[in-house]
Amino acid sequence: MRVGLYPGTFDPITLGHLDIIRRASALLDKLVIGVAINRDKGPLFCLEERVAMVEAESIKIAAMTGLEIVTHPFENLLIDCARDVGATVIVRGLRAVADFEYEYQMVGMNRQLDDTIETVFLMAEAEHQAIASKLVKEIARLGGDIEKFVTPEVNAALLNKIGRAG
């Protein structure tokens, strides 16, 4: 069984994340979405909210693809999380060259820690290359329209969270 781990903070989950989940589903038998507990990033949404959003959105993809998709909160090393969930592949999305430079370094470190776990990069589709959770939150805070970047449910949750609910 090919088990993959797609880690992220998902604060909030975007259409770019969902695109990677959909595309990874064609490559794997099971996908674990690792929701990182990253206190240094100071997420807007608490862990429970982020997990709930990821689950609500990924269940739709699981229903369409038949892939088993589960969420797994983690705050340990990514490579340890991969071992914990039985993943042999780490899935990462790339938007630009800057992402590649960082991810390339991470792959090197992860290979030193466990050379049996591979990392697979999926390039973001053109319409998703500019999407970043940080930018989506900033646009929402400044009154901009984020409907092109997140699902309607995530849009409502984000606007509610920042006090812009209609």
From Swiss-Prot:
It comes from the Bacteria. The keyword ATP-binding applies. The record marks 17 as: Transition state stabilizer. Its EC number is 2.7.7.3. It holds the Pfam family CTP_transf_like. GO terms for molecular function: ATP binding; pantetheine-phosphate adenylyltransferase activity. It catalyses: (R)-4'-phosphopantetheine + ATP + H(+) = 3'-dephospho-CoA + diphosphate. ATP binds at residues 9-10, 17, 93-95, 103, 128-134. Keywords: ATP-binding, Coenzyme A biosynthesis, Cytoplasm, Magnesium, Nucleotide-binding, Nucleotidyltransferase, Transferase. Coiled coil: none annotated. SUPFAM superfamilies: Nucleotidylyl transferase. InterPro entries: Cyt_trans-like, PPAT, Rossmann-like_a/b/a_fold. Its cofactor is Mg(2+). PANTHER family: PHOSPHOPANTETHEINE ADENYLYLTRANSFERASE (PTHR21342:SF1). Homohexamer. Reversibly transfers an adenylyl group from ATP to 4'-phosphopantetheine, yielding dephospho-CoA (dPCoA) and pyrophosphate. Belongs to the bacterial CoaD family. This is Phosphopantetheine adenylyltransferase. It comes from Roseobacter denitrificans (strain ATCC 33942 / OCh 114). The gene is coaD.
